[in-house]
Each structure stands twice: as structure tokens, then as C-alpha cells.
Amino acid sequence: MKNPNIIQPEDLRISQIIDANLDRAREGLRVLEDWARFGLGNEDFVIRIKNFRQILGKNHLEIYKLSRNHIEDQCKGLSHVEQINRNSSSKIISSNSARVQEALRVIEEFSRIHNSKLSKIASEIRYEIYTLEIEILNFNTRKRAQSIISKNNLYSITDPRENLLEIIEKILLGGVKIIQHRFKEGNDKDHLKEAIEINKLCKKYNSLFIVNNRLDIALASKADGVHLGQDDLDIKTVRKLLGASKIIGVSANNSTDINKAVKDGCDYIGVGPVFPTLTKKNKEPLGEEKIKALTKELNIPCFAIGGINKLNISSLKNHGISKVAIVSGLLNSEDPKDEAMIIIKELSHEN
């Protein structure tokens, strides 16, 4: 039975336009759906995108499909240089989201007179995609950062010194992929200026830049995330202010604080101190056995911290600890690049 609300367009070209753009929208949605499924493992995104695809498929009527004439389409196969430059998952997400949004806008306009139902559907889905694109991009960015943290065993933490940028670049050249900026002296202007410069270096070497404690500096310097102590703002508050795309690390030294941090949604945990250290003078070292006991059941990355250097890496490895955060053990080295390379190799070595 024919739907009385759907009128066959008198101009065949209108049906062709709608058909082509329904194809575009559905194809773009399929790209987004497959990345949400295989790249991000996000069931919520998959369900939402699949629903949009099914709705458009149901409304891809025969009157539109029968108008298709690829043989006489003089513009088929045209491409643009920007299509070649989609060299990251974020660019693929953005370009295919735009493809869907633009196609839906065309459908909305050209179906308004003869198929008001389709026009309304296109409008509603288009606005949903505007929001979904940002959600996917944020999740994708955070997923990348989480992957770097998961795959890399050495985490470098800074302390104030005159030639810090030079040292950090050497550490990055040594293969370190995570840098945390800890700034306990000076004023906020100097702190921010230094943070911005370190972030530039990290981006140059495709590494993560984390700011210790200071949410405001993390936001202003466009850091990849922030690392919190037990006396800092809580994770849920920081997440609201920081946004969904950034990562949050937490320092903890007991099971209660560790379990709470995991429950509240942190991305990784720093546990320590393992050994005596000048950066945590007032804290009793936990020792290797305690660190292992605290972290063995966790399903997020955990970095042991405190008094760690290349001389005790082997002992940590013997206790099943393979992810470490190091401060002076790298910064005070005569050759930070070689030191980083040696430690990374030692951490990756199977016992």
C-alpha cells in the first residue's frame, strides 16, 4: 500500500539526489559504527549508530533507488586532496561525521515537499550526529592516551631545574612516552610557560604530557591530562572540568584509596613510595612486596614510584613490577637519553 504522505517527485533529479545522499549517510554511519565497535569497543556508540542506519535504511524507498543512474553521472569518482590526508582515526571520524551531517541536510531540504516524514527524520538524526561526533572524538582521544599508558612501562616525572627542557628532550629521545610536569617552586606564570614548552616537546615526539596537581595549568597548557594527589580535588569534579577526552592519574599508597580511585574512574594509578626518596621524605617506603600486593588485582595500569633507578629495576622485575615512574633517576643522569633506553629495555625484558 502506498503511503499517502509520500509523493513521487515529479523531477527525477530530486529522487537521484535523495538516493545518493541516503547512500552517503548510511556509508558514513557504517564507518563510524565499525570504528566504535572495533577501534573503541564502545557498545553505546555502536547501538546508537546502528539505530540511525536502520532508520535511514527503512526509509531508503524504492522510488529513490530506481532513479539511480551511475552510468550517466558525470561527477562520479571525483576526489579531493584532503581525502588522502585522513591519516588518523580522529580525521576519519570527523570527515565521516561531516559526510553524514551534510548528506542529511540535503535529504532534509529535498524531501521536505514530497516526503515530510523523511525530512523530519533527517533533521533529527543530523542534530544527534553533531553531539555524537564530539562524544566519539573525546572517547577516541582518551582511548589513545590510555593505550600509550598501557603499552609503555616508563613514566618520567620532572622537578624544577634550569636546563629542564634540554633534559626532557633527551629523555623523550630515549623513548619515554609519558612526561609529568611537577612544579613546586616559582609563580604560576612561570609554571604555565614551562608547561606549554614541555607540551610542545611531548607533541614533537608523540608523547603524553601530564600536569601534576594543577587542573588550571593542565587546561591552560592543553595537557593530555592531570595527576592528582589524595589532597587534591576529587576525580569526579576534575572530570567535569577537564572534559571527557583527557586522562586522570591518581597517587595512592593503600587499598582503600586505590579502590576508590578505580571506582571513580581514574585512568592509571601511581603507587608508592617503593624505596626511600627525597621527594617523599615524610612517607614510609612500602617496599616491593606491598606494592605488588596492592596492584596485582587491578585492571588499570599502575606505576610504582619512589626511589627507583636502573640499579633496582631488576629487583622490581623479580617482584612482578614492570611499570615505574622515575624522577631523579632520569633527571640526574649524566646521559638521560641512554639512561631511559637502558631502563626501558630492562623493564621490557622477560624474567
UniProtKB/Swiss-Prot annotation:
Mg(2+) binds at residues 213, 232. GO terms for cellular component: cytoplasm. It holds the Pfam family TMP-TENI. 4-amino-2-methyl-5-(diphosphooxymethyl)pyrimidine binds at residues 180-184, 212, 251, 280. It catalyses: 2-[(2R,5Z)-2-carboxy-4-methylthiazol-5(2H)-ylidene]ethyl phosphate + 4-amino-2-methyl-5-(diphosphooxymethyl)pyrimidine + 2 H(+) = thiamine phosphate + CO2 + diphosphate; 2-(2-carboxy-4-methylthiazol-5-yl)ethyl phosphate + 4-amino-2-methyl-5-(diphosphooxymethyl)pyrimidine + 2 H(+) = thiamine phosphate + CO2 + diphosphate; 4-methyl-5-(2-phosphooxyethyl)-thiazole + 4-amino-2-methyl-5-(diphosphooxymethyl)pyrimidine + H(+) = thiamine phosphate + diphosphate. Residues 129-351 are annotated as: Thiamine-phosphate synthase. Keywords: Magnesium, Metal-binding, Thiamine biosynthesis, Transferase. This is Thiamine-phosphate synthase. The gene is thiE.
